[in-house]
Swiss-Prot record:
Protein name: Probable allantoicase
UniProt cross-references to InterPro entries, sorted A to Z: Allantoicase (IPR005164), Allantoicase_dom (IPR015908), Galactose-bd-like_sf (IPR008979)
Hydrolase keyword on record: yes
Family: Belongs to the allantoicase family.
Enzyme class: hydrolase
EC id: 3.5.3.4
UniProt keyword list: Hydrolase, Purine metabolism
Pathway listed: Nitrogen metabolism; (S)-allantoin degradation; (S)-ureidoglycolate from allantoate (aminidohydrolase route): step 1/1
Amino acid sequence: MNADHAPFRHYLDLADARLGSQVVAVSDEWFAPASRMLQAGEPVWKEGVFDDSGKWMDGWETRRKRFEGHDQAVIRLGVSGVLKGVDIDTRFFTGNHPPAASLDGCFCAEGDPDDGTSWSEVLPSVELQGDRHHYHAIDDERPWTHLRLNIYPDGGIARLRVYGVPYRDWRSQTPGTALDLAAAINGGRALACSDQHFGPMVNLLKPGRALNMGDGWETGRRRTPGHDWAIIALGHPGSIEAAVVDTLHFKGNYPESCSIQAAFVEDGNEARIEAQSLFWRELLPAQKLEMHHEHRFERQLNALGPVSHVRLNIFPDGGVSRLRLFGRPQLP
């Protein structure tokens, strides 16, 4: 599967170290630590760079195995969730990549797995090649807190991306508590947009402020009438009380203004959501934006009651690093 046929990449990377994901157990990391697999940045090659163990590699690399068995790394996800797909990335590992890999999962309500933990197969053994992405869709609705990456028998992995939907028990949410309903860690999803030439829409919902301009949503320069937009499904329906539109790092390419529309969309109607969104009610009337600035809107919001989806409109084009929608979830 290539990147163009891996739609699950629009989901949150649950193994991202920035979410708090950690390697809690590893069979071997002689040449390079397993923690490097979880770094957010793309792997790099450093020509002629060596350390005490050998050639410096941007990823996890084990020594050559001289006995039976295989290597493995156990990862505690920063956010537990349901997997939609994985990318086992072997970029820059050639001649030292594993021929195959598999993935297991478990759910630990507290703590980390031990010798008595029961593991379930998430991804059966798949063939790996050197210096390339390996995308695999996952069709399993069980949530996981930990994953175990098995490589056969040894070798190096540059990055492990685990795309999925964060798991949250909304029944345990304290009634009346406000939180960011659009945040990816709360189940928010970027569904569609007019353009994402320079930066994907999924970046809008990432935790924390953007690392750089590439860590936001940015459209191409519009040469035709109209404006750009992105549609977001909230992690849970709720009443929005505050909106934050952050243009951090966007200076000569920020939108002149923005507005937000919203609606409560019944289950099963997301397939037609782009056309429907044109007629959604106005949550935030058009507001001027500034470059490299975090804009917070409260009094400007219209009281619409519970909504499940929003449409961020930017005029006419440009970049937004983050969108936050704070509100109180509509609980059973």
